[in-house]
């Protein structure tokens, strides 16, 4: 495990996070219309409830704070966060086949945990992440190269999700 891997893990866990609301819609036209409404004073929360196709829509677009280093969130979203100010509405952001609108709802959350205090933990987490990545690579490779007969439904579902194969 490299020092940079440990530092990256530290950034993911303890790095700057941004409290946000999001709206996810299926088209640029709708995203543009919604952005205009929001910039005209419409409530982000009410608009998210009305239009968002994301599961957060029911909560007015409220999601857990987004860490700018967390790869769970697409880089297109993470890259915008440091450039927005509180209550500012982002321009529509394309993520896969959907459009996302973001509003920063509060000041960035900055951890006061020193790296040195958690370095052993970062080593362990980094090692686990690397092992998981390598196991997923191996699993995908084996699935592609070999025909398997699997009798356990849980294993079938897990492997199907790895291979993106609906069979």
Model-derived segments and spans:
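Cell-wall glycan
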Residues: 11-14, 21, 67-86, 167
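Soluble non-cytosolic domains of exported or imported proteins
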Residues: 1-4, 17, 24-29, 38-42, ...
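FKBP-type peptidyl-prolyl cis-trans isomerase
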Residues: 22-27, 47-51, 91-110, 121-122, ...
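Solvent-exposed, amphipathic alpha-helical segments
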Residues: 30-37, 80-83
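Extracytoplasmic
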Residues: 15-20, 29-31, 58-60, 88, ...
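Peptidyl-prolyl cis-trans isomerase
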Residues: 34-76, 94-95, 105-117, 145, ...
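Gram-negative outer-membrane assembly/targeting C-terminal domains
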Residues: 153-167
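Acidic/polar surface patches and capping/hinge elements
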Residues: 1-19, 49-50
């Amino acid at each position: 495990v490299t020092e940079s891997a440990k530092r990256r893990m530290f950034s993911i866990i303890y790095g700057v996070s941004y409290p946000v609301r999001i709206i996810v819609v299926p088209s640029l036209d709708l995203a543009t219309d919604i952005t205009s409404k929001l910039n005209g004073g419409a409530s982000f929360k009410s608009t998210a409830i009305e239009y968002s196709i994301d599961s957060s829509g029911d909560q007015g677009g409220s999601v857990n704070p987004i860490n700018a280093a967390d790869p769970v969130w697409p880089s297109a979203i993470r890259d915008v966060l440091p450039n927005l100010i509180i209550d500012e509405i982002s321009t529509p952001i394309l993520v896969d086949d959907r459009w996302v609108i973001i509003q920063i709802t509060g000041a960035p959350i900055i951890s006061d945990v020193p790296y040195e205090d958690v370095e052993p933990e970062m080593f362990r987490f980094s090692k686990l992440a690397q092992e998981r990545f390598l196991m997923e690579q191996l699993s995908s490779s084996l699935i592609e190269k070999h025909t398997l007969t699997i009798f356990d439904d849980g294993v079938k579902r897990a492997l199907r999700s790895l291979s993106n194969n609906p069979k």
